[in-house]
From Swiss-Prot:
UniProt gene name: ccsA
UniProt-recorded name of the protein: Cytochrome c biogenesis protein CcsA
A GO term from the CC aspect: chloroplast thylakoid membrane
Disulfide-bond pairs as recorded: none
NCBIfam families listed in its UniProt record: cytochr_II_ccsB
Length: 305
């Protein structure tokens, strides 16, 4: 009872802090302040500690990795969204955009798990015999890291497309406004103006962030699929059974393999590969969440209504 109470307290603390961090990150988009952004990036350490302790407590009293139902998988998903920025900061320590993407994602998944799912689905359940294996920790952890990192890369690509679209709309709007003189238009569209230079820098940064996160996520997804195949062979005597989750995982893998191919071999950057990565967002969510809603297959957590 004490552990369950502590778990609920940590859940509320985590939600409160991640909500504040999300709002602050949103504010830095409108009013960029580097010192504030850096402080918020460091501030995510505390909610990450809270949700980590939350999962450890649930692991302790349930006697297994907390992934027995949809609620626990969503909480684990939220934990992964808090973990990803630490990976990205190793390669790109000055990247502000990753927090803008991961904080709302962590908030959304946590809010859905705690506020939308019924109470009975939030209770810990016993693992079925096939899942009582050491492979559970490796396979599920790796595959979830793959899902979350790919989602971050896809969301970065959507942000890139949105910024480029806004840039084009601003161009046409300003160009056809009669009250603007030729000199003002020339300054506004000059590629070396401070505003355009800053926006171009941002686009380049987001493009690189998207590529970097997708490469990491693709690696995790590949390892996760391979480890899952080995586990399936041990549990059911077959490496591949065309389970709905397996099919959608393969489709997702092919989508992002195509993205990496056109980036590396064709040298495409900007909108074209971003469109492919944006499409991947749909397939990742179907692979994870859609199969669970259907409530079919070995990997389903069941219908939640």
């Amino acid at each position: 009872m004490i552990l369950i109470t502590l778990e609920h307290i940590l859940t509320q603390i985590y939600f409160s802090f991640i909500l504040v961090i999300t709002l602050v990150f949103g504010g830095t988009l409108v009013y960029p302040v580097n010192k504030l952004s850096n402080s918020v990036k460091k501030g995510i350490i505390f909610p990450f500690f809270c949700i980590t302790l939350n999962l450890i407590i649930r692991w302790f009293y349930s006697r297994h990795l907390p992934l027995s139902n949809l609620y626990e998988s969503l909480m684990f998903f939220s934990w992964n969204f808090c973990l990803i920025p630490f990976f990205i900061d190793i390669k790109n320590p000055n990247t502000q955009w990753i927090g803008v993407i991961t904080a709302p994602s962590a908030l959304f998944t946590h809010a859905f798990a705690t506020l939308i799912l019924p109470i009975e689905m939030q209770q810990s359940q016993r693992l079925i015999p096939a899942l009582q294996s050491h492979w559970l920790i490796m396979h599920v952890t790796i595959i979830f890291l793959g899902y979350v990192t790919l989602l971050c890369g896809s969301l970065s690509s959507i942000a890139l497309l949105a910024i480029n679209l806004e840039k084009k709309l601003s161009f046409f709007t300003l160009y056809f406004r009669k009250e603007y003189s030729y000199e003002n238009k020339r300054k506004a569209f000059h590629p070396y103006s401070f505003k355009n230079f800053r926006k171009s820098q941002m686009i380049h940064q987001i493009d690189n962030l998207s590529y970097y996160t997708i490469v990491i996520g693709f690696t995790f997804l590949t390892i996760g699929i391979l480890s899952g195949a080995v586990w399936a062979n041990e549990a059911w005597g077959s490496y591949w059974s065309w389970d709905p989750k397996e099919i959608w995982a393969l489709i997702t893998w092919l989508i992002f393999a195509n993205y990496i191919h056109i980036r590396l071999n064709k040298g495409w950057e900007g909108n074209k590969p971003a469109l492919v990565a944006s499409l991947g967002l749909f397939f990742v969510w179907i692979c994870y969440f859609g199969v669970n809603i259907l409530g079919i297959g070995f990997h389903s957590y069941g219908w939640f209504l």
